[in-house]
Regions:
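Non-catalytic all-alpha helical scaffold/repeat segments
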Residues: 1-172
């Protein structure tokens, strides 16, 4: 929605000012979840403190009410990943999506499966899993997950595992 986008931009400009409001609307039911997601996206855009962001993110990422925003939640894990804040729970969250999420159910862009890989939940999760190569403790599960993804029925998901495969040369 246009108003949610405006809210996201306002939060990006003043993330610390809007944080209490984001927490308040997270706990309420009368305001659309679009605003919660927009506010959290604004925190990422505004380079809000990554450690504090991780605390906020962990309050919502497993909540069923946010399942329709899964792609945006996956994208937000990139902010945590670039700040070395992926823990076992978040990594497992990504692996579960990569292996079990129903999206994609069909090919969206048959002429460009690479683009398609960035526009579905399983593909995006695979991209983010590969980017977790810096975490030595996840090395085995990264490869196990990619091995399973190789059998995914959707080309775009399998392609997602190949795009960044070269970075895994850094894993022992």
């Amino acid at each position: 929605s246009e108003n949610a986008n405006a809210f996201e931009n306002e939060v990006a400009g003043r993330p610390y000012f809007f944080l209490p409001l984001i927490y308040k609307i997270m706990d309420g039911e009368e305001i659309s979840r679009y605003y919660v997601i927009a506010g959290i996206n604004g925190l990422v855009k505004g380079n809000y403190d990554p450690t504090e962001f991780a605390v906020l993110f962990k309050k919502i990422y497993k909540e069923h009410i946010y399942s329709s925003f899964k792609r945006q939640l996956i994208r937000m894990t990139g902010y945590l990943n670039q700040n070395d804040l992926i823990d076992q729970d978040l990594f497992d969250f990504l692996c579960d999506i990569a292996l079990n999420d129903p999206d994609p159910a069909k090919v969206l862009n048959p002429n460009n499966q690479i683009i398609d890989s960035f526009n579905n939940n399983r593909g995006m999760a695979v991209h983010e899993i590969v980017r977790c190569f810096r975490y030595k403790r996840f090395a085995e599960k990264i490869f196990l997950t990619l091995f399973k993804v190789a059998n995914d029925p959707m080309d775009s998901v399998r392609i997602a595992s190949l795009i960044d495969l070269a970075v895994l040369m850094n894993v022992d």
